[in-house]
Swiss-Prot record:
Modified residues (Phosphothreonine): T64, T69, T419, T1240, T1254, T1285, T1466, T1500, T1516, T1729, T1735
Segments forming domain Myosin motor: 86-781
Classification via InterPro entries: IQ_motif_EF-hand-BS, Kinesin_motor_dom_sf, Myosin_head_motor_dom-like, Myosin_N, Myosin_S1_N, Myosin_tail, P-loop_NTPase, XRCC4-like_C
The Myosin N-terminal SH3-like domain, residue ranges: 33-82
Subunit structure: Muscle myosin is a hexameric protein that consists of 2 heavy chain subunits (MHC), 2 alkali light chain subunits (MLC) and 2 regulatory light chain subunits (MLC-2). Interacts with SLC26A5.
Subcellular location: Cytoplasm, Myofibril
Naturally occurring in which organism (per UniProt): Equus caballus (Horse)
Positions of the UniProt region annotated as Disordered: 1124-1146, 1152-1171
Function in brief: Required for normal hearing. It plays a role in cochlear amplification of auditory stimuli, likely through the positive regulation of prestin (SLC26A5) activity and outer hair cell (OHC) electromotility.
Entry GO MF terms: actin filament binding; ATP binding; calmodulin binding; cytoskeletal motor activity
Underlying gene: MYH1
Protein's UniProt name: Myosin-1
Amino acid sequence: MSSDQEMAIFGEAAPYLRKSEKERIEAQNKPFDAKTSVFVADPKESFVKATVQSREGGKVTAKTEAGATVTVKEDQCFPMNPPKYDKIEDMAMMTHLHEPAVLYNLKERYAAWMIYTYSGLFCVTVNPYKWLPVYNAEVVTAYRGKKRQEAPPHIFSISDNAYQFMLTDRENQSILITGESGAGKTVNTKRVIQYFATIAVTGEKKKEEPTSGKMQGTLEDQIISANPLLEAFGNAKTVRNDNSSRFGKFIRIHFGTTGKLASADIETYLLEKSRVTFQLKAERSYHIFYQIMSNKKPDLIEMLLITTNPYDYAFVSQGEITVPSIDDQEELMATDSAIEILGFTSDERVSIYKLTGAVMHYGNLKFKQKQREEQAEPDGTEVADKAAYLQGLNSADLLKALCYPRVKVGNEFVTKGQTVEQVYNAVGALAKAVYDKMFLWMVARINQQLDTKQPRQYFIGVLDIAGFEIFDFNSLEQLCINFTNEKLQQFFNHHMFVLEQEEYKKEGIEWEFIDFGMDLAACIELIEKPMGIFSILEEECMFPKATDTSFKNKLYEQHLGKSNNFQKPKPVKGKPEAHFSLIHYAGTVDYNITGWLDKNKDPLNETVVGLYQKSSVKTLALLFSGPASADAEAGGKKGGKKKGSSFQTVSALFRENLNKLMTNLRSTHPHFVRCIIPNETKTPGAMEHELVLHQLRCNGVLEGIRICRKGFPSRILYADFKQRYKVLNASAIPEGQFIDSKKASEKLLGSIDIDHTQYKFGHTKVFFKAGLLGLLEEMRDDKLAQIITRTQARCRGFLARVEYQRMVERRESIFCIQYNVRAFMNVKHWPWMKLYFKIKPLLKSAETEKEMANMKEEFEKTKESLAKAEAKRKELEEKMVALMQEKNDLQLQVQAEADSLADAEERCDQLIKTKIQLEAKIKEATERAEDEEEINAELTAKKRKLEDECSELKKDIDDLELTLAKVEKEKHATENKVKNLTEEMAGLDETIAKLTKEKKALQEAHQQTLDDLQAEEDKVNTLTKAKTKLEQQVDDLEGSLEQEKKLRMDLERAKRKLEGDLKLAQESTMDIENDKQQLDEKLKKKEFEMSNLQSKIEDEQALAMQLQKKIKELQARIEELEEEIEAERASRAKAEKQRSDLSRELEEISERLEEAGGATSAQIEMNKKREAEFQKMRRDLEEATLQHEATAAALRKKHADSVAELGEQIDNLQRVKQKLEKEKSEMKMEIDDLASNMETVSKAKGNLEKMCRTLEDQLSELKSKEEEQQRLVNDLTGQRARLQTEAGEYSRQLDEKDSLVSQLSRGKQAFTQQIEELKRQLEEEIKAKSALAHALQSARHDCDLLREQYEEEQEAKAELQRAMSKANSEVAQWRTKYETDAIQRTEELEEAKKKLAQRLQDAEEHVEAVNAKCASLEKTKQRLQNEVEDLMIDVERTNAACAALDKKQRNFDKILSEWKHKYEETHAELEASQKESRSLSTELFKVKNAYEESLDQLETLKRENKNLQQEISDLTEQIAEGGKRIHELEKVKKQIEQEKSEIQAALEEAEASLEHEEGKILRIQLELNQVKSEIDRKIAEKDEEIDQLKRNHVRVVETMQTMLDAEIRSRNDAIRIKKKMEGDLNEMEIQLNHANRMAAEALRNYRNTQGILKDTQLHLDDALRGQEDLKEQLAMVERRANLLQAEIEELRATLEQTERSRKIAEQELLDASERVQLLHTQNTSLINTKKKLETDISQLQGEMEDIVQEAHNAEEKAKKAITDAAMMAEELKKEQDTSAHLERMKKNLEQTVKDLQHRLDEAEQLALKGGKKQIQKLEARVRDLEGEVESEQKRNVEAVKGLRKHERRVKELTYQTEEDRKNILRLQDLVDKLQSKVKAYKRQAEEAEEQSNVNLSKFRKIQHELEEAEERADIAESQVNKLRVKSREVHTKIISEE
């Protein structure tokens, strides 16, 4: 636990993350009795805290905190943890681990708003339902780089750990955020993305691209902005969540090698399309609709031609229209800015809004039924005009396509009429399709924008998918979502419980396998395995006559009673019908299968789709352009369709994407975050125990903690452990001898003072218990700190000793000087000493004069030699200038060539990538070829059968040929007859279709009765079985128990055997996987090393050889395909002959059908009569409704009159009040009488229903007779349908073969072109590579020559050093310059060669890219052809669906006619009663009005919670308003008592009025709901205002934080500059010390020689003045020589080092390439074996299924529903309190923002002032030190001048001049050689440039040829399409002629 000071870095988030120091101390000092403090089970709260009173006989008596005394069993009593574990951050550290401890820890942390808690290896988060300040920028920086144990639990800590694992382990990571709907997954996903975008920023702005519009932000901005856009179009309000994700997404964030953001992409899964057109009452549609209508941007309202009222649009107003927690106006601005940041163009932005508005208008399209027809027609065109305008269509064409779509029948298109229901269904399907495709297109555009093409190495994936859902109405979408969650939970269980324990076994650790009972395979297999739910659904979709009922029956047959997870639900009143139930891990869900077949097939109106494709809105045309665009649109759904499938259903596509997701997750290292819902009412701070416990059990939280505590969650390889932790005890591992890593790790751990039971040694790794690795890290940090402090102490001691030695030397030298000075001062005034000073110079004056003369002569000679040397030097300088100019020119050329070589290297990398892609494509092609071969084999078998049949038919053909001449003469006459017959056939087909529909309706009714009968029989059988079982149960229990024991023993034996086999298989697989992992690690290391290498020429040669081999293989494959094409052509000709024979057979069958049609004419007449009667009844019904409306209008008028009269008579109300009170009791009695009369009416109604049932039985008998009559017709239609399907199948096969032939021919042409181009490219590449290899060899040869010359020059330099001895060494300076120039030129030429090679490679890659583009165009053609075939099948299915809908419509019409008949009977009775009681009807109507007005007052009474007495008093007050009518009412009462018959009539009227009153009550309830929603809306507006303020403050704080970050960066730069200046200062001080040492040495030498030179110096002063200038020049030359000598040494070292590194790199490159190839082959074989073993393991695991826990009790839900009303009031109060609190927080935040701004300004000023002053001080200090250095150098020069005044110096100078002449001649020769080499290099560079020009011309030529090839391909494609059309026309003509 960290202190409060350490938590200060988290700012205001600290109290929400960790307990304070004070709380921790209080918890430790809190009194606690471990024996008596317990949790006990409680029926209401699940568990409560209690104190044990006594323990007796296995039972415990305890007293709860509430004061109640309870007695429970021992197993229901759980010990409490000590107080120091309260609010513990990692629940795995608790002493007592059980459900109540985990529950109360989460509850106490949640009460303190600590929403994140570690649970072993993963994190648990509880939804706070409010905003918490734990996601600020300062929190992000605080978590950056922190270990898990160093910081409190947080989603940022999980994210940072994943980021650090990715960098250290070099492995892809994934973060799985799971939980039920409304648990907070989406919010946590956004926080993870925010964290990565903050810590891994690139800081680079994207370049502006012409295709995608202006760029508005960096990559991290775009990643963050993708969320608001996707949420606007993909999130909606549900019952459990205001911002529920209605689609799944997997966000991959890619990072470069340095850990910076490189790119990102998003994969989406299963958008809930049905929400576009339908919402439940408590839900609403997607946010974007309501954002647009929020009127934040009025220009959008005008552009989309819409209003701001959502209730004006049917598609978006079926549920709620506002959400309290969402500000639609603010969200609209966020969505709009996200569109701009993500680079959408203005046209794309407008088209997005237009298509969204068009979807809203689609919901308002109205259609009506034509009079006396079933055909639909538009009911007004205003809405259609708006929708068509927004979609760029013609409204007339749109309406025509909807009402009269064109359907393909055979080879012709037919216009088909649609009913109103069919048109509405088509409109809904189109709206959903437009919205879905637009959403997928937006995801694809976002991915395109986020793909920066930067190099990327690893990624972190974040999964946010819709949570587990249990609604009242659960459909196909909920099944897919729940299945996904089931798979993810299974992945979690497998990763946490199975793989973990398998690794222990594999590593040889002693471990007993623990079965946690968390296997979900049974439910998963029930859904996805063969003959599972999805399989049966897809099978039913393939049958055109399949219905929801047949689908349900198949499910029951296959799974009911056979699978424990599949059940038949019990009907519940008030809830929608459910057809089957599945027991999921999170509970039992009831599913309704209505419309699943249509949802799965997802049919569309093809005529409207054709209009969309021609739309003027480019985006809409792109969305529906075909499969090529659809594939591109499909967001994260990479890859096309599976081969061989004509179309793909929604469930198949969903499963394919889910399998891809699971594959991605298995290839990563997962990190789990479990989101928990605390309560169902979205109340902040409240936690429902049972709900949380259920989620903890389902999610495996307790099991995860247990395996974390029992197991070894941390592990590390032995070599890594030895390398990292060797520092803890280096003496444990002996130096100088090799020791195995495992043994070294064992010795190291054995020598450390830790608990040795906390770790285990495996075969390859050492395993640690939880927390031990953190302890080792702390020990390592402490040890490193000790070592560093010791090193620093030793360095400081050494420096102190050196300084002390210097001080001692200075002291001795000072003493020496003082002694000599004192001695001289004592003797200088002696007379003899003065005489000595005078005589001493005179003694040697003569000698000195001679010496001076000689020296003058020598001086003149040296002057002449110096002048000559100067002249030569000038000549050499001129030559050097010329050479420098040439060198600069060469450098420019070499630089250009280096650039080209760099380009060539990049192309080489791209070639490797394209090679891998080509290999993958070749594999796909081979697989397709194998499939085609299988299909070909099947076709050949069919062909042989057909040939046999043809041989039989040929005999008949011979006979027919004889009669053919006669038939041709009668052809013209028969053609007319045939036309008439075809028309009659069409009519008969329609009648047959109608009859079949009626028959199906009858069959369904019959089936329903059979089902009911079967259900009743099942109930009887179950009752009898239960009875017999209960009777036999007592007798059989003992026997069954013994049998169960035996069976259990047998099962345990079999289980042990299977476990042994499983373990063996698992061990073998784990060994293989371990080897694979090691190989992968080695491979990754080698790849990382290879990425840093520069030269890849040898790899290119190997690639070229492999490509040649592949080309040869492809050529052979093409030849085989050509042979197959020829065989297919021959089979096609035979098949055409067979098709003509079949068409003749069809004609014969049609003639038979015509004969059979006569038998059904009587039935047709009966049907016509029934239809006429039906139309008559419908007209009567319409007339009755008109009469009803007229009477209602008259009654309304009377009501208005009575209201006016009552208004005038208000004054009389007071007088008649007493009378009304008397009549109150009388009216109560009347009401009782009316109730009794109602009971009699209900009995009469029951009798009528019995009569209806008898009539229905008679009708069923008639239907059975009709079925017998139609059986013959059905047989004939079945034969005809079979023959038609066979003919269609043959025609489809022929079309497929045609397309296959054309495709193969195009593929052949493309391959031949590619082969020729690749041959040319290979030849050019081989030539270029040979030239480059030759150039490389010559360069190496030149390097060898230079190395030899360099060695010779070293010897010469040594001679010069010995000879010169600090003389004039300018010649050496020239020599070193020439050497460095030569080395630089060789390096520059090598770089130029590399650039040329890179340029060549770029050209080749471009050619390959163009070839790939051609191949992709061919693929798109093929996909288009497949899509056309799919669309044809979809059309047939839509026709079948339309027929089914027609059948349903007719059944409904029949039911309506029956009810109409009943209505007419009751209407006749009503008219009879009205005649008898017309005199009383007006009075009763007034009474009814008074009663209705009393019900109107009911709303206010309910709000005020008044009782029944108040309601009755209000009723009497309303009746009192009748005024003058009271006396008439008394008369009415008397007449009612007298006339009993009239009372019965009045009772019927009263029944109708009561029904009306019930409607009024419903309206009142609706109004109450509206008031409630209005209150919620106001609360939401307040919340939105508060959220807005919060967001504003957060933005301000974020801006302040960014400014602070910038200031921190500037301060860091200043510190870096300061450090650099300090380094320079240290160097200057070192130079100063060196100069001081030189000065001290000079002084010592000076003292030694001073005594000798005293006599001669006086005489030589005058003579040497002329030589001082020359000596100063010599000193300068010596300094230059020393500097040049140092440079030579450095250059020599660098040259040798680079040469060695180059050779090593080349050798490593060769080794790595060979290893890569070897590892690749091994890896492929290992993958294949792994797949086989995985399938075996999955089969073995399938035999060990466990029972899934049961779901929540329904009683708890009922209790929660009862308490909802009370909770609403409490929520209102809490929200008011929170709003006041947030208002105060707002003011505090504003004040803090101002303070922060003020502090920031002060910090900026201080930083600027402090930085400038410090820099100025450092610069002044540097200048002072430079001055000191210069002064010391001057002193040193003066000292050298004194030392060099000796006679031998002149002789040495003469000797040196002679040696210089020789060296100059030698250097002259060297210069000539270097010039010749430079010329040779120039020639090579010119040749390389010519070669690059030739390659560029070839590239342009190839590019031109490629463009011509593309044009030819387009022309050929158009010709093929024309020929196809012609062939179809010819085919139709042939059929019509036959």
